[in-house]
Regions:
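Positively charged n-region of N-terminal signal peptides that target proteins for export
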Residues: 1-5
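Bacterial N-terminal signal peptides
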Residues: 6-14
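Long, structured stretches of catalytic cores involved in phosphate-ester chemistry, encompassing
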Residues: 21-85, 89-613
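Sec/Tat signal peptide C-region and signal peptidase I cleavage site
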Residues: 15-19
């Protein structure tokens, strides 16, 4: 798998016999630490600092004797002083404790198991092992009837009952909800100790990114139990609309003019700075931000600061000309009607004409020098034991849907290249189980806002695959022909459910962590709490779901859930007591356990056994 490489991050790994706090450090950690990229011999730690500088991590197996250390330097202001360090040389399946030097910011983690420790030539030659993970979506911390409250009670439950029992987590979209998006570059410059002449290039070209950075800091500061969770549990993430902007559609639709659509790359850049670093990515080329010279009626884009011949555009997304207003990233329906830059739209790059010149489609509408960006591809894959996980990007390449024509054969949720990557990866997989992680739902439509105030006025709402039926049905038919089970893990809708699509294909939606629940009769196509359901050409079986009746006031729809997934591959059968001798099940099992987020009580469990009719 390919991991995001932070080339500007300087690592200084320095194991010491007796690591200890030195003199007070001038660099203060303001956010984090957070854990990611778990492996059997390493773990990555993320922090943000008040200024660029060195951070030292003390760690060890004994909580009271952190005898090793690893130092690194955070990145510059263009990344909001964020950075990561990967601690290598760790023992597999082992609990480590750590603390940031000269801080009270501490945590712990367990490395992933290693196949070599479970191999048994006669009973488990491949070294399969068991593991668990938690997944859900929707961390909305807002009050006023938008959530379970700013205290984020689910994370109290997770910290007390779950974190020591799992190997990792997947936050399947909407980790972030929009706050502070109107934070100004001037406020940010003061915060980071820079004058206007020192403004980083990214802030010059995309000034509204500072509001997204502040949005992340706002949630990390107010969500102390959330921050505690991330200090102990390595997490993978998908980016959904709220990481970018609520109800963002059509970012892959050439010619589409929409304020929200063209905020994609700004939100995505901030997501990589704060969360996306933790993910494996198939393409590691970052987005390009620039200032374009456009001429009315011309299909030429010029940028004297660019060298397009050095950009591998086949590994990048399409081009957006930004809206250009200070409130471009604020989720407010009234702002959608306010004009942006006259050339703001979604563009296709037709040809590179030279280092500084592109041919684009459509043609420019006006003379101007607007800000623009060429987007980043955000999907990737990782493997744990006999399970492959495909993390999809359901927002970057999405064409404009049509609720009245959901079978449009040209409509796409993930784009042709990502679709091919997904099918090729699954076709070539040697694993027993396939997990496809989609931030949006597969069989149930998302056609209502749950009574929220902010709505996308330009198009009828449906975030789900139910308005991309050709692509969805192509995937279901492909998956159903495999000799392995496929589990589509979804989020977005603020309800949990377990759905059997075919004998081989299942959808499991988990959440919300803290957001208010949707009312299925209004927001989810009138689906039942369980039983047969058909929305579009295919019927499915809803085995169980969380549910909110339509007569419950919005502020009272607080039924948060989370799901713990347990993969049972092996059992221990030692000759002597307390020994280890692992045998692989002929038919491994995956158990999905849905829990009440307030109490941790088990609400539903579904077990799939591989290879049994």
């Amino acid at each position: 798998m390919n991991y995001l490489l932070t080339v500007t991050l300087l690592l200084f790994l320095s194991p010491q016999a007796f690591a200890q706090d030195g003199k007070p450090t001038p660099i203060r950690v303001t956010d984090g630490p957070m854990l990611g990229r778990p492996a059997s011999d390493s773990m990555t730690i993320w922090v943000r600092t008040d200024r660029q500088g060195e951070v030292n991590v003390l760690y060890g197996r004994n909580e009271n004797k952190l005898n090793l250390s690893s130092s690194f330097r955070t990145r510059g202001a263009q990344f909001d002083y964020t950075g990561t360090v990967t601690i290598n040389g760790l023992e597999p399946n082992t609990r480590y404790y750590y603390r940031i030097e000269d801080h009270q910011l501490d945590g712990s983690f367990r490395t992933m198991p290693s196949a070599k420790n479970f191999k048994n030539p006669n009973g488990n030659p491949e070294g399969l092992f068991n593991f668990r993970f938690e997944f859900a979506c929707g961390n909305n911390p807002k009050g006023s009837g938008d959530s379970a409250g700013p205290t984020l009670p689910v994370f109290d439950t997770l910290n007390k009952q779950v974190r020591e029992k799992i190997n990792f987590a997947i936050l399947n979209g909407d980790w972030l909800y929009e706050t502070r998006r109107d934070y100004s570059p001037q406020e940010w410059l003061y915060q980071v100790g820079l004058n206007e002449a020192e403004t980083p290039r990214i802030v010059q070209k995309a000034p509204t990114i500072v509001g997204v950075w502040q949005n992340y800091k706002d949630l990390l500061h107010r969500g102390r139990n959330l921050s505690e969770w991330h200090r102990h549990v390595p997490t993978y993430f998908t980016a959904d609309d709220h990481e970018l902007i609520n109800d963002i559609y059509g970012a892959g639709e050439t010619g589409y003019v929409n304020r929200r659509a063209v905020f994609r790359d700004i939100g995505t850049q901030a997501w990589f700075d704060y969360l996306g670093w933790a993910n494996p990515t198939e393409h590691n080329i970052p987005a390009w931000f620039g200032a374009a010279k456009l001429t009315k009626g011309s299909d030429l884009l010029e940028d004297e600061d660019a060298d397009f011949t050095k950009l591998d555009l086949d590994q990048m997304a399409n081009l957006h000309v930004h809206w250009g207003t200070p409130t471009a990233g604020v989720p407010d329906s009234a702002l959608d009607a306010q004009p942006g830059d006259p050339n703001s739209a979604v563009y296709e790059i037709e040809e590179i004409l030279g280092p500084n010149k592109l041919r684009i489609k459509p043609k420019a509408k006006a003379d101007g020098r607007p800000a623009y960006s060429i987007g980043r591809r955000c999907y990737g894959k990782f493997t744990v034991s006999n399970c492959d996980f495909f993390l999809l990007d359901t927002r970057t390449h999405r064409s404009l849907h049509n609720v009245d024509n959901p079978g449009n054969p040209k409509a796409t949720m993930i784009g042709a290249k990502q679709l091919k990557w997904l099918k090729d990866g699954i076709r070539d997989s040697k694993s027993d189980f396939i997990f496809v992680v989609s931030s949006v739902n597969f069989m149930v439509p998302h056609v209502g806002s749950g009574g929220g105030d902010d709505k996308q006025a330009a198009i009828k709402k449906d975030d789900a695959w139910t308005v991309f039926l050709k692509e969805r049905e192509e995937l279901i038919e492909f998956w159903d022909g495999l000799d392995k089970s496929v589990f589509v893990l979804t989020g977005d809708l603020h309800n949990s459910f377990a759905i059997k699509i075919t004998d081989n294909v299942y959808e499991f939606a988990s959440g919300p962590h803290n957001s208010i629940n949707h009312a299925p009769m209004k927001d989810e196509g009138g689906r039942p709490s369980n039983g047969k359901f058909k929305y579009g050409p295919r019927s499915c079986d809803i085995r169980w779901s969380s549910y909110a009746m339509a007569d419950i006031p919005r502020a009272n729809r607080t039924f948060p859930h989370y799901c713990v997934v347990q993969v049972n591959n092996v059992f221990n059968n030692p000759v002597e007591r307390d020994g280890e001798r692992w045998f692989a099940f002929p038919h491994p099992q995956v158990i999905f356990q849905f829990h009440d987020a307030f109490t941790g009580e088990l609400r539903y469990s579904e077990t799939i056994v591989q290879g049994l009719d």
